[in-house]
Amino acid sequence: MVNIVDSGSKHAPQEMEQFLPGEGKVMYKIQPRKSDTEQALAGNDFDPFALRDNPHPTTDNETLTHLLKASLGTGILGMPFAFMCSGLIMGIFSTIFTAFICTHCSYVLVKCGHKLYYRTRRTKMTFAEIAEAAFQKGPKWCRGFAPVAKFSILFGLFLTYFGTCSVYTVIVASNFEQLISYWTGTAVSLRMLICIMLVPLILIAWVPNLKYLAPVSMVANVFMGLGLGITFYYLVQDLPPVEERESVVWSTLPQFFSITIFAMEAIGVVMPLENNMKTPQSFLGICGVLSQGMSGVTLIYMLLGFLGYLRYGSATGESITLNLPIEEWPAQTVKVLISLAVYCTFGLQFFVCLEIIWDGIKEKCKKRPTLVNYVLRTVLVTAAVVLAVAVPTIGPFMGLIGAFCFSILGLIFPVVIELIVHWESGFGKYNWILWKNAIITLCGIGALVFGTQAAIKDIVKAYSNNENVGE
């Protein structure tokens, strides 16, 4: 258990030195062997958070800013339509339930990641690496599925967020197309506007890391906040009595959940945010970054959905901006602000795609990593823009991909990981973790089925129109 090392200097006697001969006290010094130190570190002495090496860590407030921006995307504009599908009262409780499920799954993913940090002696891991480690450290029957789990998550995340980048490009270009056509009275090519956006998108993709991207997300939050503020101004004008609207609608309630889940879901950015935090422990907890961010997001979602449906009733559009009078300058300002917010959000969505590809090739690019990294950024942005130019109607297809990927990645995979991580330690009293995760899995399957159904209807609707898109 000890090494005896030659020492020519006087030192305070250690416990074992008292039993050495007199000459041994002078000639030798007692030290723990290296293996003893390693064994100690395998216990509670290993702190993955203290050992984490982040050149540009983000503060709690910066992480909260990113989380708000990731959750307050364009999906929030569909909440009034979602409330029309559920009814006013049912919409409130269903929004809280959906937000709780989405937040809990994100919490579970990060919590399992923290447990696996100690088991694998690693200081940070991505979503895919957490799944891989959980399967590798789990029971024997699931260890062979570790590579499949990792690849499935990487493929699903990249497909979803790369497609989202293309959709964001189309959204920004479409809003400016509507405004330019209204102001000038002449039609403008949507594809041309998408091409014009290439350089600005490359510039925002060149922001080196999440630390420097935080101010951009803050600006995006300001733009989105101002846009929503003007929208709320329209919504509170001439409100009818609550009794004139449906309180509970059962027939279209599944459509409410498909809209709300995919609007709130931000599972792809959770681990990148946690991995880049200065104090990762602050991400979880009752007053943690995740709880604070999702509480605020849930409140905004409920207010917009409730007031939007109350104001416009059965005439509520799939996006609340469709109900705003385009001839009035405040409504036009909303379109500009939301377009700018979406543009600023592009960098955060793009970071997920970049991290996936870069983690796979960085070991092969040690000579000029910075140059290769920026070339990769440029190529990915260009590919996203080319996809948007080729298929301006990509939105409905992304709805289908999102329904499939977010249901599995955002709801089902986190609870499966939790079950495997707790396999040996047990699932708690009365197996409550097992029953809880079974309910969440059923919700995920429901979101998958009904979300896919709604997305297919949108695709049919988009291509049943005979007009040429993008000309």
UniProtKB/Swiss-Prot annotation:
Name its GO BP terms in alphabetical order.
Answer: amino acid transmembrane transport; dendrite extension; dendrite morphogenesis; regulation of cell projection size; regulation of growth
Matching entries from InterPro entries are given as: AA_transpt_TM
Location comes to: Cell membrane; Lysosome membrane; Late endosome membrane; Cell projection, Axon
Protein name, UniProt field: Proton-coupled amino acid transporter-like protein pathetic
Which residues carry a glycan?
A: N61
**General function of this protein:** Amino acid transporter which has pH-dependent electrogenic transport activity for alanine and glycine but not for proline. Plays a role in positive regulation of growth by directly or indirectly modulating the effects of the TOR signaling pathway. Required in a cell-autonomous manner for dendrite growth in neurons with large dendrite arbors.
Q: What happens when the gene is disrupted?
A: Severe dendrite growth defects in class IV da neurons which normally have large dendrite arbors, moderate defects in class III neurons which normally have medium-sized dendrite arbors and no effect in class I or III neurons which normally have small dendrite arbors. Induction of starvation response and altered protein homeostasis in class III and IV neurons. Severe defects in axon growth with mutants showing no defects 48 hours after egg laying (AEL) but severe defects apparent by 120 hours AEL.
Q: A Pfam family matched by this chain, by name?
A: Aa_trans
> Which species is the source of this protein?
Drosophila melanogaster (Fruit fly)
| Gene Ontology MF, one | L-amino acid transmembrane transporter activity
Keyword annotations of the record: Amino-acid transport, Cell membrane, Cell projection, Cytoplasm, Endosome, Glycoprotein, Growth regulation, Lysosome, Membrane, Neurogenesis, Transmembrane, Transmembrane helix, Transport
